């Protein structure tokens, strides 16, 4: 937990391999939720423990499930977006090279696939996530500053 305490932001991935690839790509700790259904609980627990940190949920984009008659939902994207929204965080999803998803939609869903299967490779993991993390940190800092200012204004109003 020291690594998370010292990290500039909390990054959460759905699976272990994805968390590993992201950690390698951004050179920072990443938490694996192990299942899309667990993203919400993990995001809330970490947000409660580290309320001053930006939360980024690096989600799976399960487009292939849209064609499955039993599912017909992009579960990975839905769960990641819900978890991020619940903690005021940001959900991010990998962007693949043109044509890669068309050849194997189920094989190109997450940041591990981006780093290990895409022609863009691990450099793309860094290129796609670092700006998203930096933006989330900047937004979190602004939010904290607004909250402090509002608190000061309330305190000054009570003293009068």
Short names for language-model regions:
Residues 1-7:
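Glycine-/acidic-rich phosphate or pyrophosphate-binding loops and their flanking alpha/beta elements
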């Amino acid at each position: 937990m020291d690594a998370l305490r010292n990290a500039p932001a909390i990054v959460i991935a759905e699976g272990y391999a994805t968390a590993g690839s992201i950690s390698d790509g951004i050179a920072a700790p990443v938490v694996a939720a192990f299942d899309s259904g667990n993203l919400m609980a993990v995001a809330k627990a970490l947000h409660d423990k580290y309320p001053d940190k930006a939360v980024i949920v690096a989600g799976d984009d399960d487009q292939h499930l849209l064609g499955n008659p039993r599912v017909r939902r992009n579960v990975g994207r839905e769960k990641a977006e819900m978890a991020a929204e619940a903690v005021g965080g940001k959900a991010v999803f990998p962007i693949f090279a043109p044509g890669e998803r068309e050849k194997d939609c189920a094989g190109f869903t997450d940041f591990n696939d981006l780093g290990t299967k895409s022609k863009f490779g691990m450099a793309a993991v860094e290129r796609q996530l670092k700006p998203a993390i930096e933006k989330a940190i900047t937004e979190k800092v602004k939010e904290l500053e607004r909250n402090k200012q509002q608190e000061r204004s309330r305190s000054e109003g009570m003293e009068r």
